[in-house]
Swiss-Prot record:
Family: Belongs to the purine/pyrimidine phosphoribosyltransferase family. PyrR subfamily.
Keywords: Glycosyltransferase, Transcription, Transcription regulation, Transferase
Gene Ontology molecular functions: uracil phosphoribosyltransferase activity
Protein name, as recorded: Bifunctional protein PyrR
Superkingdom in the source lineage: Bacteria
Motif extent (PRPP-binding): 97-109
InterPro entries: PRibTrfase_dom, PRTase-like, PyrR, PyrR_bifunctional
Annotated source species: Elusimicrobium minutum (strain Pei191)
Gene Ontology biological process terms from the UniProt entry: regulation of DNA-templated transcription
Reactions catalysed according to its record: UMP + diphosphate = 5-phospho-alpha-D-ribose 1-diphosphate + uracil
Role summary: Regulates the transcription of the pyrimidine nucleotide (pyr) operon in response to exogenous pyrimidines.
Length: 179
């Protein structure tokens, strides 16, 4: 059974709020950057970047991070993993980086992203923005900006659909029946 958590309009309002939360903590200058974790994290970062520009009139640095080779579960993901480009067209040293992803679960994706990011320099600070924090952490990782805290059972699946990738915007929870 699939349960709708947020529709497209609600997801857009969530991203508006997150953009305002980022602006409450940061000046928009060349020391702040949004870096999206592939795949859906890049679209979230782009949307936050656009919303911040609409509010402030200022551009935010933007990058895309592929963590495939940094995953500790690489052999479980695919026999032949598909690598996508990492595109961080600026020096991250001394910058505040806001990593963006769709769902925060065990923390392992973020651990991999931190390892990958360290190959590009030494930021002064790294923060985390996620659309959904579903709990069940296996590592001591906490998001700085959260669209929705959604306590789940480990057997449930959170689906975030973004129109750039999935053709529509929504957050749904797949609840498995105990039949």
């Amino acid at each position: 059974m699939e349960k709708l958590i947020k529709d497209g309009e609600e997801l857009n309002r969530t991203l508006d709020r997150m953009a305002h939360e980022i602006l409450e903590k940061h000046e928009i200058d060349n020391t702040l950057a949004l870096v999206g974790i592939r795949t859906r994290g890049i679209y979230i970062a782009r949307r936050l970047m656009e919303k911040i520009k609409k509010i402030t009139g200022k551009d935010v640095l933007y990058g895309e991070l592929d963590i495939t080779l940094y995953r500790d579960d690489l052999s479980q993901v695919a026999e032949q993993p598909v690598l996508k480009a990492t595109n961080i067209p600026f020096d991250i040293t001394g910058k505040t980086i806001i990593l963006t992803d769709d769902v925060l679960y065990t923390g392992r994706t973020i651990r991999s992203a931190l390892a990958a990011l360290s190959d590009f320099g030494r930021p002064s600070r790294i923060e985390l923005a996620v659309i959904v924090d579903r709990g069940h952490r296996e590592l001591p990782i906490k998001a700085d900006y959260v669209g929705k805290n959604l306590p789940t059972a480990k057997t449930e699946i959170v689906h975030i659909k973004l129109k750039e990738y999935d053709g529509e915007d929504s957050i749904t929870l797949l609840v498995k029946n105990n039949d």
